[in-house]
Amino acid sequence: MEYVTHLRPDGTYQSLREHEEQVAALAGSFAGEFGAEEHARRTGLLHDIGKYSANGQRRQRDPEHTAKVDHATAGTQLAFQMKDPFAAFAVAGHHGGLPDGGEKSNDGSGTLWARINKHLTGGDEPSAWKTEIHIPEKVHFPEWIFSEKDSRGRTMYTRMLFSCLVDADFLDTETAIQGKQARGGGETLDCLLKKIRAHTAPWLQAPANELCAKRNSVLARCMRGGEDEKGLYTLTVPTGGGKTLSSMAFALSHAVRHGMKRIIYVIPYTSIIEQNAKVFADVLGAENVLEHHSQVEIADDGEETPEAYRKRLACENWDAPVVVT
């Protein structure tokens, strides 16, 4: 029997094995940024094993005449059996959002424990996955999640793992149905750092007046500060002191110094976001800066330019070097 998922416009199906393996590969590549590649790969393999059940396959092949099937519980339960609550949460919520943990006595509710307690029998039993994919019993976990003195690090890790899985699942499904989309793009942060240095070099060399000299002092300190160790930093400068470019210079310098790949610039008020985003786009290039907030109009009318289309896609998962929000 061929196990399938995702009906394409041409009437063919994506194989379930292909989807499982490609979601695992994508999730692993995303999670590699925080040392969780192996763990995310296994989570990707777990996420859709419920579709290997008889009812799951009937639903895939004839959705109009078949009731919805809970395909997330099987992977959730297997993750729990593997003593992997992180993956259990991620798999349980990969369509509806992260569930509450609940209580061990829960039954029939939307909590994680209710899924773990659910009894899969007959047409919902998905053991056929074992004929197509290999899910490793043991994987490497980042050591830092177990060294935290409280649970905050582990809850953040769960959300990060969940995010990697959901993005990978969405992207592979999109590719299977619509073909490869114009995602990604933009220059490296190293290139953007060179741009901001080139833009500000004339100011540093010859300040026009005393105010410009003070702005230069702020800028120079931010650039030097970017070389410091990771941590939380504050920049306290009066209005007119040049915080916009100085703070971005710090961010780019710091990110390049520590091998990071994205700047997320978070500020209040949409008017200020729009103003700062324009400054960054003028210096760094519009193709490298994504402005995303409640007032951004994202057209989907078939008339948009390739660049506008790429930015609309980037708003879905912030796939841009610099995000201003």
Feature-to-residue mapping (PLM):
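Accessory nucleic-acid engagement/destabilization modules that flank
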Residues: 1-198
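Conserved pre-motif I regulatory segment
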Residues: 19, 200-236
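Alpha-helical scaffold elements adjacent to nucleotide-binding pockets in ATP/GTP-utilizing enzyme cores
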Residues: 74, 78, 90, 250, ...
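Walker A/P-loop
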Residues: 228-254
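Pre-Walker A (Motif I) flank of P-loop NTPase domains
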Residues: 228-235, 261-262, 319-321
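Post-Walker A helix-loop "phosphate-sensing" segment adjacent to the P-loop in P-loop NTPases
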Residues: 253-262, 284-288
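Conserved Walker A/P-loop ATP-binding site and its immediately adjacent core
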Residues: 260-283, 296
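Inter-Walker segment of RecA-like/P-loop motor cores
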Residues: 285-325
